Curated annotation (Swiss-Prot):
Keywords assigned: Calcium channel impairing toxin, Disulfide bond, Ion channel impairing toxin, Neurotoxin, Potassium channel impairing toxin, Secreted, Signal, Toxin
Entry PTM: Contains 8 disulfide bonds.
Tissue spec. comment: Expressed by the venom gland.
GO cellular component: extracellular region
Organism: Varanus acanthurus (Ridge-tailed monitor)
Name of the protein: Cysteine-rich venom protein VAR7
Disulfide bonds: C77-C156
Domain SCP: 41-158
Entry superkingdom: Eukaryota
Similarity comment: Belongs to the CRISP family.
Molecular function via GO: calcium channel regulator activity; potassium channel regulator activity; toxin activity
Subcellular location: Secreted
């Protein structure tokens, strides 16, 4: 059985207002093992809360190859297009991707929580609870077969 890898990208568009944040871009770099742990722990914590509970939810772990792919996606600064499938295929597995964009710096936990909060518009066994709502970020976070991930952040000029 081929297990899916989850590939998440936090492609942040950042235009800081003076004095509104104490975060620095360096504080969010995914080359920092503490940031990697924050991202993994947040995903695993949220995945444990799905309702109904998954019978066989896999635990997420960090993957540097996926993180490099996420970095390439984040560097593109393309907020309207996902990476082509060929750019998201790692080890023969097509990976999903999530983007989070903000006009000011946010923690990784904030962005991941915003994806997870799409659960308010999702019903297990049914799908979106109404037309036009986003639930794909949520389903990427909680997909039970996903077990590896990598993330990246970038400051985009526009």
């Amino acid at each position: 059985m081929i297990l899916l890898k989850l590939y998440l990208t936090l492609a942040a568009i950042l235009c800081q207002s003076r004095g509104t944040t104490s975060l620095d871009l360096d504080d969010l770099m995914t080359t920092n093992p503490e940031i990697q742990n924050e991202i993994i722990n947040k995903h695993n914590d949220l995945r444990r809360t799905v309702d109904p509970p998954a019978k066989n939810m896999l635990k997420m772990s960090w993957d540097n190859t996926i993180a490099e792919s996420a970095k390439r996606a984040a560097l593109r600064c393309n907020q309207n297009e996902h990476t082509p499938v060929s750019g998201r295929t790692i080890g023969g597995v097509v990976c999903g991707e999530n983007y989070f964009m903000s006009s000011n710096l946010r923690t990784w936990s904030f962005g991941i929580q915003s994806w997870f909060d799409e659960r308010n518009y999702f019903k297990f066994g049914f799908g979106p609870t109404r037309a036009g709502v986003m639930v794909g970020h949520y389903t990427q976070v909680v997909w039970y077969k996903s077990y590896k991930m990598g993330c990246a952040i970038n400051l985009c000029p526009n």
